[in-house]
Curated annotation (Swiss-Prot):
PROSITE patterns: CALPAIN_CAT. It is found in: Nucleus. This is Calpain-7. Belongs to the peptidase C2 family. The modification N-acetylmethionine is found at residue 1. Residues 541-701 are annotated as: Domain III.
Amino acid sequence: MDAAALERDAVQFARLAVQRDHEGRYSGAVFYYKEAAQALIYAEMAGSSLEHIQEKINEYLERVQALHSAVQSKSADPLKSKHQLDLERAHLLVTQAFDEDEKGNVEDAIELYTEAVDLCLKTSYETADKTLQNKLKQLARQALDRAEALSEPLTKPLCKVKATNIKPKPPPTRTHFPLGTNPFQEGPQPFISPQSCDAQGQRYTAEEIEVLRTTSKINGIEYVPFMNIDLRERFAYPMPFCDRCGKLPLSPKQKAMFSKWVRPEDLTNNPTMIYTVSSFSIKQTIVSDCSFVASLAISAAYERRFTKKLITSIIYPQNKDGESEYNPCGKYMVKLHLNGVPRKVIIDDQLPVDHKGELLCSYSNNKSELWVSLIEKAYMKVMGGYDFPGSNSNIDLHALTGWIPERIAMHSDSQTFSKDNSFRMLYQRFHKGDVLITASTGVMTEAEGEKWGLVPTHAYAVLDIREFKGLRFIQLKNPWSHLRWKGRYSENDVKNWTPELQKYLNFDPRTPQKIDNGIFWISWDDLCQYYDVIYLSWNPGLLKESTCIHSTWDAKQGPVKDAYSLANNPQYKLEVQCPQGGAAVWVLLSRHITDKDDFANNREFITMVVYKTDGKKVYYPADPPPYIDGIRINSPHYLTKIKLTTPGTHTFTLVVSQYEKQNTIHYTVRVYSACSFTFSKIPSPYTVSKQINGKWSGQSAGGCGNFQETHKNNPIYQFHIEKSGPLLIELRGPRQYSVGFEVVTVSVVGDPGPHGFQRKSSGDYRCGFCYLELESIPAGIYNIIPSTFLPKQEGPFFLDFNSVIPIKTTQLQ
């Protein structure tokens, strides 16, 4: 953080606060006094040497408290008339016409200029306000003059052309690819051809295009990939824009309080997209999206601390400096990272209010500021409405920023957690700006929540991490903007706070006693005890190399559980060139979600398992043992981190796994690395498949070779291969039985060479599945005997032959 820049922010905010205070605009004054105080808090954290900084902070916060009653009693400024709003819309039409004019899009520019003229003339006839009439007529003249100037070159040549030769302008087509080689990297994105895919220059396959097309439809609405052409989206209209998808469904709590839908100009006479990006001004209401609001808060805090656009860059329209702007026509476009790629979400600006005119959605404490409510609305639209089932910050932050999600469970039997190592990592990475962090509580009783000032299963934004003489602290914000921690180091704790610690943390217990904004300090030990999960979102810029594959796993492929066989699981080869000093490779598995019920009742437990098998296909889950075993969780995102320490080439097999496969899933596997790598699906070398359906029944359930008297009664099949080549044989039987098979040579054609054999087996008998893969089997005739380990184990089985050469099979017994 830049202390000098924060000091300048504080001076600017204080000046605006005092100005509004003197003008009697108390709501604005309250907002800017808070922002000035927060800027000074951050400046002190960054090493500011300003004298009496704490006194100034307290002065601003005391003025906030004093103004609260004045805000309640003061009547609001009059709202703009319809005709004033029409003038603003006309100005936007002309502005967007001028943009198209500059780009040489003559026909689009003429259309926009003409609509501006029509709107200005219509409104000038309707209003009796002479000043407004003059402004409208002046704007109409300017627009008309430019439209006529543009029309002249078009109309002159057309006079010589026969009408039959005139063809209508074709509608624009979406032939461009989503922005950028890596849409998550900062900076301008290069244009990419329609076929391109990723940072490694690969093209999308037909399967990938179909995956992205299929998962574009979310809750019945299509959200297409965000493309270069979308930067030319039209935002100016003569009438207020209405989303053709209709109003968002409300939650039951909203319905109970709902009065009507309003636009920003119905609430304030000076709507603005962003006054200042602040985590402290964001307030959640009755929508159950605490994790989303916490995600907005930490994104805003990041922007303020590091002066890098993160959250405010995703909403359009934007000016030429890339800053989001208020649109009097009411149309907005938000770029969200959904189902594998950045996608385009169109909304209008209608928001729900209660009978008192209070918003029933999240909002900024500065009521004229819109970005919080509009970004929330876009996300709620995708999620099916304000009746949001709830989420977690990994999902929300990935959608908002594209940053890499990671989950740390502090009380999990399957995941180890080190308090000391975790704190050191979080402290270092947080202050470098590498990571965004939230913390969530788990299930607790109402009495426990009341005792400790915590909300059960609730997400809190992490705003700061500090350490002082061996004591470790986390600063949290409750998205509700009220209700704080009541344990150690709360504002009411008279035992543990020392003057020295208060100075270091810039904390005066008297200040929060005056105003509850939901922000508090908690010790790291208490957070680890009373909270359940820490959600991290990593800056993808840390790992410059990235590529992805989009794919589908059909529910019909393989068994429901992959506890015994991975033969039908999607598998990938990852080859990494590790430099001196080591490297990190992260693999993010993201399941695409297209249905609200799926999101609310996520029953798909996914994971990624890593094997060191030189990129070869893995058939048995535990043979060889996994290099990194995955934990199956019902979150759409799963991150695997591979740490490399020795230089050279490292080759891995990555296996997508589910706990119980019930449904077909679409997913994206994205690899991030600081060093070069290649990543691809493991292809099947086989082009010919043949399946035999058989069963062990009665006498034919003879068991393995240990049972000589009955083993000879097992089914026997014969297969004939005309040419030498590779062969894969798989046997699937009931999971409760251990199964295996033998292959016996009957005859071969010519000299079998080194690949000849008399007898081969599938190895140890295994539950439900076994296989034998031969690099080359000589041309000839062979018998195969499938069996269970014990006699009298009856049931069906499947024998699958996979080769590049046609196979003839017959049953001998």
